[in-house]
Regions:
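Flexible, membrane-associating and regulatory peripheral segments of lipid-active enzymes
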Residues: 1-48, 54-70, 106, 242-246
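Surface-exposed loop/turn and secondary-structure junction residues enriched for glycine/proline
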Residues: 29, 36-37, 56, 147, ...
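Short amphipathic alpha-helical segments, especially helix-boundary/capping motifs
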Residues: 21-22, 36-42, 70-76, 96-98, ...
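Serine-dependent carboxylesterase/thioesterase catalytic core
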Residues: 45-58, 62, 68-79, 85-181, ...
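C-terminal catalytic-base region of ester-bond hydrolases, centering on the histidine
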Residues: 179-246
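Alpha/beta hydrolase fold serine-hydrolase catalytic domain that processes acyl esters and thioesters
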Residues: 2-10, 15-28, 151, 158-160, ...
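A broad, low-specificity signal for short, low-complexity segments enriched in glycine/proline
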Residues: 6-12, 35-37, 142-149, 172-173, ...
Length: 246
């Protein structure tokens, strides 16, 4: 599947999809309560979950609970509410890297990183700078192909931080670069907040894009298909990563 950058400029989701996001997010959560446990069972390795913009421990709790029940050791990102990078971007990543180092040391195993929306940017960048500590990266609706525009999350970022001046052309080009660890980008064509094309990864020997059809942006952490994809990806033996084959 081609990268987002080769399919034309990303277009912001319609206002109708945006307006329906809260209700659809609730519906996705309710659907997850009725979903059977995944067939794939984990090997106990640690997973850090990074929330989306304006999200925090509460928003990722259902996903972390799912991971724990699936046989992993799930960690919150430890920074409270996600209002965007605080100060210099790389200094901010240093703080997140400290948690990655601590979790890796505690388990003596590589750590999988799951990032929802903006949280996926953190996961990808940590994997680029600390690849030996990272087992794989999974992003949920992360618009690394168009962070500064064409998405309603950028508007929210401006409301929280005043502007998107940190997102220079150089940084945006850097964010689009694929981590050199197994990477799965999950996207939904019915995402009401970010353009789905901007959430698609290049197809390489260790990266892929997987569609979670019907999922809302706010429901990406609980939608049954997303959970099935996440469970399948995490259950692959270390060093034997293969692309998704639905």
């Amino acid at each position: 599947m081609p990268a987002a950058s080769t399919t034309g400029a990303p277009v912001a989701p319609s206002l109708a999809l945006l307006a329906l996001e809260p209700l659809r997010g609730i519906a996705d959560y309710c659907a997850s309560l009725l979903t059977a446990s995944p067939k794939a069972h984990g090997d106990g390795h640690p997973v850090i979950v990074f929330p989306g913009l304006a999200g925090g421990p509460l928003s990722t709790r259902p996903l972390r609970r799912f991971l724990d029940k699936s046989g992993y050791v799930a960690y919150d990102w430890g920074q409270g509410l996600n209002t965007g990078p605080d100060g210099d971007f790389d200094d901010w990543l240093d703080r997140l890297d400290d948690l990655l180092v601590d979790v890796h040391s505690a388990h003596g195993r590589r750590v999988s990183l799951i990032g929802w929306s903006l949280g996926g940017i953190y996961a990808r960048e940590l994997a680029k700078r600390s690849a030996p500590l990272v087992r794989q990266v999974i992003t949920l609706g992360t618009p690394f192909g168009a962070m500064a525009d064409a998405n309603h999350a950028a508007t929210a970022w401006r409301l929280l931080n005043g502007d998107t001046s940190q997102l220079t052309p150089g940084l945006q080009a850097r964010l689009r670069q694929t981590p050199k660890v197994p990477t799965t980008a999950i996207y939904s064509k019915t995402d009401g907040i970010v353009p789905w094309r901007a959430c698609m990864e290049q197809e390489t020997y260790c990266s892929e894009s997987v569609e979670a059809s019907g999922a809302s942006h706010l429901g990406l952490g609980t939608h049954p298909k997303v959970l099935r994809i996440v469970a399948n990806r995490l259950a692959q033996p270390e060093g034997e990563w293969r692309r998704w084959d639905a």
